[in-house]
């Protein structure tokens, strides 16, 4: 079975106003002691043989604050399988052609840039520290450094949002050579700066849904095939790491606030970097991964839920009432169903939570 490895890098220049992830703003680099703490945990989970993950994902925080030699130290400790996908999230303002070439030499073969918008005024509203010019330069530097697998993030339904802003951002990312795009609706998290002081000019729920459908159409038109609610790729460039999550595979997350599911059991590290550094943060068990998780995660994917696999894995079948509800969804344009596979359309993905409430 495939194994995905996630390494959390909780350091960043500044906290974006929409972000509620566990991180430490005001940092200009990653302490070597933190890297060694991650190596310690890698050794702990694989005392007799290396983990050899199929995918390795550096998330954050801002993982591009790592020095290339630190990334190499972690990759060497994990010993990923030949052909593994190794992704590094990066903020455009933190990279140079030299640093990107160093990451490439260290073993990183996929880079993911947090672009969000091509408009500097919007970036300032979001609290992003980069400019559109820096985003363009980062894509160009990544290509020159030898990256052929490049992803870019777009945020939708931002304050005073327009379709023109989306088009400008898509153009920047596509012209940059992106093979993959993640497009997310802005979500106001209670513990974020936006949660405490919401920005003016936010779209209504209906307007946000329209922006989402517009984005899906434009991305598909430009050759980025939708394979998950928020993810689009050129053929063959789907993000393998996140597919392990959505297909309910095994994944190990290391670092404060990192979550895992191994052998059907969930656990996580407490969000406490000091305790993690001092080897005083044992993982906390957090229940099991079961049939409900499988249904929820599979219906995020455009390929949908195989009812045959659902029955084979969990012994579950849809009831007569559930099947009747599915047919109602098909008639409403929210889903397709051939008797074996239930898949949500883009319109259905927008109201996925309401659909799941009837199926669970």
Give the positions of each predicted feature:
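Local cysteine-cluster metal-coordination motifs and their immediate loop/turn environment
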Residues: 10-23
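Short, amphipathic alpha-helical interaction segments positioned at domain boundaries
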Residues: 347-360
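Minor-groove-contacting beta-hairpin "wing" of winged helix-turn-helix DNA-binding domains
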Residues: 341-345
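Immediate flanking context of iron-sulfur cluster ligation sites
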Residues: 1-9
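Internal amphipathic alpha-helical segments of the cytochrome P450 catalytic fold
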Residues: 13, 306-307, 352
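A short, conserved structural fragment
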Residues: 331-340
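Short amphipathic alpha-helical interaction segments
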Residues: 316-328
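C-terminal scaffold of the Radical SAM
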Residues: 2, 23-47, 54-316, 337
């Amino acid at each position: 079975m495939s194994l995905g490895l996630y390494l959390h890098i909780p350091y960043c220049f500044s906290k974006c106003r929409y972000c509620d992830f566990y991180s430490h703003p005001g940092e200009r680099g990653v302490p070597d002691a933190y890297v060694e703490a991650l190596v310690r945990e890698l050794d702990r989970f694989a005392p007799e043989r290396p983990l050899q993950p199929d995918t390795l994902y550096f998330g954050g925080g801002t993982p591009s604050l790592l020095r290339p030699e630190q990334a190499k130290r972690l990759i060497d400790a994990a010993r990923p399988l030949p052909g593994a996908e190794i992704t590094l999230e990066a903020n455009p303002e933190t990279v140079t052609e030299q640093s990107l070439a160093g990451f490439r030499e260290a073993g990183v073969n996929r880079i993911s840039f947090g672009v969000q918008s091509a408009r500097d005024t919007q970036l300032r509203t979001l609290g992003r520290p980069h400019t559109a010019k820096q985003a363009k330069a980062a894509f160009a530097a990544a290509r020159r450094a030898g990256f052929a697998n490049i992803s870019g993030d777009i945020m939708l339904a931002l304050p005073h949002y327009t379709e023109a802003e989306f088009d400008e951002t898509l153009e920047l990312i596509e012209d940059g050579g992106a093979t993959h795009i993640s497009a997310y609706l802005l979500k106001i998290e209670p513990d974020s700066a936006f949660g405490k002081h919401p920005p003016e000019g936010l779209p209504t729920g209906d307007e946000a849904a329209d922006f989402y459908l517009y984005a899906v159409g434009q991305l598909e038109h430009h050759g980025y095939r939708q394979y998950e609610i928020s993810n689009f790729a050129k053929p063959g460039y789907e993000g393998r790491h996140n597919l392990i999550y959505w297909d309910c595979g095994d994944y190990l997350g290391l670092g404060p606030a990192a979550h895992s599911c191994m052998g059907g059991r969930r656990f996580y590290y407490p969000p406490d970097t000091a305790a993690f550094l001092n080897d005083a943060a044992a993982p906390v068990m957090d229940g099991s991964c079961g049939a409900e998780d499988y249904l929820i995660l599979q219906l995020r994917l455009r390929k949908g839920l195989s009812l045959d696999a659902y029955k084979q894995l969990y012994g579950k079948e849809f009831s007569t009432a559930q099947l009747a509800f599915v047919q109602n969804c098909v008639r409403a344009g929210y889903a397709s169903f051939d008797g074996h596979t239930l898949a949500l359309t883009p319109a259905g993905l927008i109201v996925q939570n309401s659909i799941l409430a009837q199926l669970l």
